[in-house]
A protein has these predicted regions:
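Conserved alpha/beta-domain cores
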Residues: 1-197, 203-205
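Paired acidic/hydrophobic, glycine-rich loop segments that form the ligand-binding mouth/hinge
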Residues: 48, 210-211
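Expand to "…catalyze enediolate/carbanion chemistry for C-C bond making/breaking, isomerization
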Residues: 183, 201-204, 211, 216-223
Length: 224
């Protein structure tokens, strides 16, 4: 068994508990296509990319493989057409303008683009995301009016800290926002939270999707 396969099996053992379905998104940014193919051989089909150019290249080169691509990077207006073309999921939506561009640019032969609203749960200015419930609700309402987008839930990143109480409080905040949205008439199921260092805590707090890179692929690579 390869190291990569062993890592995937270990993580899936952690996240696949009875009565709890959690999707593993393998963050493959900066890693070569050969690493993605090795992960596919090990049974992994959901992959996350941060950079549009890299997503486009990999999606084209690996088009014959059953991959579900998740865009997890910062959205730029001049690159939304490529995201709309290649991604099945977008985890980082924060602006009405981007939502409308993704909706208008989604190819007609594809199903609606699954989207998550990014929420800043850490309070850190270096992290993206909306910071109050009113703005989250407003954007969610707009997304629901766009036929080529399908709002599924929320995404957030916790602080980079060893303090588990701080991390749990931040994850619980995201979970509470999802509950508020559903109380307001939305029907959302997904919480994308948890990375290599905190995914177990995230699952305890209700995460349905975890984004893990280095724990699977090792440290970042910068070339194929």
């Amino acid at each position: 068994m390869s190291k990569l396969q062993d890592s995937l099996n270990s993580i899936k053992y952690d996240i696949n508990k009875p009565l709890k379905k959690v999707l593993l998104v393998a963050v493959s940014k900066t890693h070569p296509e050969s690493a993605i193919l090795a992960a596919i051989d090990a049974g992994q089909f959901d992959f996350g990319e941060n950079y549009v150019q890299e997503l486009s290249r990999k999606a084209e080169n690996l088009a014959n493989h059953p991959i579900c691509w998740h865009f997890i990077g910062t959205i730029q207006s001049n690159k939304t057409s490529q995201i709309a073309k290649y991604a099945s999921w977008v985890h980082t939506l924060t602006k009405e303008q981007h939502a409308k561009r993704l909706n208008d640019q989604r190819p007609t032969n594809l199903s609606p683009l699954n989207v998550l609203i990014e929420v800043n749960i850490s309070g850190e200015e270096s992290k993206g995301g909306l910071t109050n419930y009113k703005d989250i609700n407003t954007l969610a309402t707009i997304i629901n009016s766009l036929p080529n987008l399908s709002l599924k839930g929320l995404m957030g990143m916790a602080s980079n800290t060893m303090d588990e109480i701080v991390i749990k409080n931040q994850f619980n905040l995201l979970s509470s926002y999802l509950e508020q949205l559903n109380n307001d008439g939305f029907n959302l199921t997904e919480l994308s939270m948890g990375m290599s260092n905190d995914y177990k805590l995230a699952i305890e707090c209700g995460s349905t999707m975890v984004r893990i890179g280095s724990k699977i692929f090792g440290e970042r690579s910068y070339g194929d």
